[in-house]
């Protein structure tokens, strides 16, 4: 069966292919090979630029341009050529080394030093740097922009709904009023912190040989400061240098990154469920798109499908990302191969995350507030004012203030008239009593509006 979006095993390459296209250049097999190519070429150029290595002369501008062109012009057709070589070698990194040698064999300047391609490297020297570059590219070009779009929309809605009062629900029961804008501001603030954590994770790299000790490097050039050279090279790629490794870079930084994404995803999953609940209560309506169908049998339905899709994909993402974070730092002795197949699923976990972000943003764009229903909800729950009334009573020394309000309101519905009749009996200053008599559930929102506008 030919592979296409209808026959793809994973929905990321099938139904949702267009929505995760931004990640394909980073986490596909092509993306991995291209990242490896960049590392191999930059390593060769760095060796040539170091005067200490007299056996490899500095490249001319033309030679450097030819090497850079290999990276710039590398596409799926070139990746297929590498895969064809791998069919013989049964080794992916060695196949790329042979491909580079073949593509540069017509250049006498490069072919003369072709044995410095992949010089002193173990495959993991190339792979760890490639994986870090892939994650960095995806983080900067696709994932952070997607989170920023959600953050921007949440701030926009928080400001728009800053003063629209809403009855809170703690344990699913009526609780102290807030505003819808403040609740969305809560999510925006949490996401801002999670986003900062994602952005702050330093991705590490190493290029220190088979077990991390520069054995082969020092055998070829004894006494040379290979650690300093490796540090400069890794940092030239925009990565942080890890001086202590086994054959693999231990992946602690990748684990930190995936944990950080999982934390952001949990925040957004929480938001998905809350918005779903507000839609269920009728506090939000969803804009209807002509031609769309909500149910195959119930024509009236407008379902919260975007938030449900987001919740499902973020859950899938976290299952994978948490496994990556737990598994990757563990390797038997100086290395085993269990990380290799797991690392190939980085894009799957982050792909489901990106799908979740896309669906959530789409859903947020469809929301319309139902302020009248929210006010009616508050108007039906005047017992919410038990909190401010008993607090003012306590200020003025009224004995058993909490207990008196508990007797009046616990498990009961109390009308406006009932609450005001109770207030009228209180032995508190007349000004305080007047303030309580003016108080309503819809204006008992504290600093909610201010906090929402401030986000």
Residue ranges, per PLM feature:
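Glycine-rich cofactor/substrate-binding loops
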Residues: 1-34, 62, 85-86, 282-284, ...
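Proline-centered turn/helix-capping motifs that create local helix->coil transitions or kinks
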Residues: 104-110, 199-202, 280-283, 318-322, ...
